């Protein structure tokens, strides 16, 4: 694909090369060649709470996904974008979060979009399972209740436990939910009706403290140890 189309158009329109690099839209190779960072990718824009675009996530969606080292590419931190401060979809979801008095945190942008299209609009994403205190505090401005929906593998479970501790430390209530058959929220939302999705979330979310206790006791049959 053309790895210069955006930068060529931007330079022609009068944008300075230094700003294309500072904002992370482009980078320079050792030979001085200016490269479009998101060439050949579907772009998801990250909006600030005030509705301004501050960064991007680029994802390979076609057959090149197989074997591609970087399926996702994110904007690097810049003067206007700090990954540890932003939450994908929060600007669009903040009113729904207030109305529901609850926020659902998922791993990816596609998860947010599919769930929103299935009428679950109080949903946001970080960068995978990474979560920071600043992101939690930003969510706390809109609600005291958060549900984590992560992949059900060991990495997802461990991330849910780790992030639950972080969220509890900020005085919020936390529930966790793992979808069946290794599905992610994007898959589940596409294969179920909006009503089924809402019902599954309502009936299968577990308080994180209870989840931690059950996981600790899993396989322990000695009544004294239990």
Q: What residue ranges belong to the model's regions?
A:
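Phosphate-handling DNA/RNA-contact segment within nucleic-acid enzymes
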Residues: 3-142, 146, 159-160
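Hydrophobic alpha-helical scaffolding
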Residues: 79-83, 125, 129, 149-153, ...
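Phosphate/diphosphate-binding loops
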Residues: 154-170, 174, 178
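Short secondary-structure boundary/capping segments
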Residues: 119-123, 163-166, 191-194
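C-terminal or mid-to-C-terminal helical accessory/interaction module adjacent to the motor/catalytic core
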Residues: 171-226
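Active-site-proximal loop/turn and secondary-structure-junction residues that shape catalytic pockets
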Residues: 48, 110, 152-154, 180
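Amphipathic alpha-helical transducer elements in NTP-driven molecular machines
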Residues: 87, 133-136, 140, 156-164, ...
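Conserved, well-folded catalytic cores of nucleic-acid-processing
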Residues: 13, 59-60, 142-149, 166-170, ...
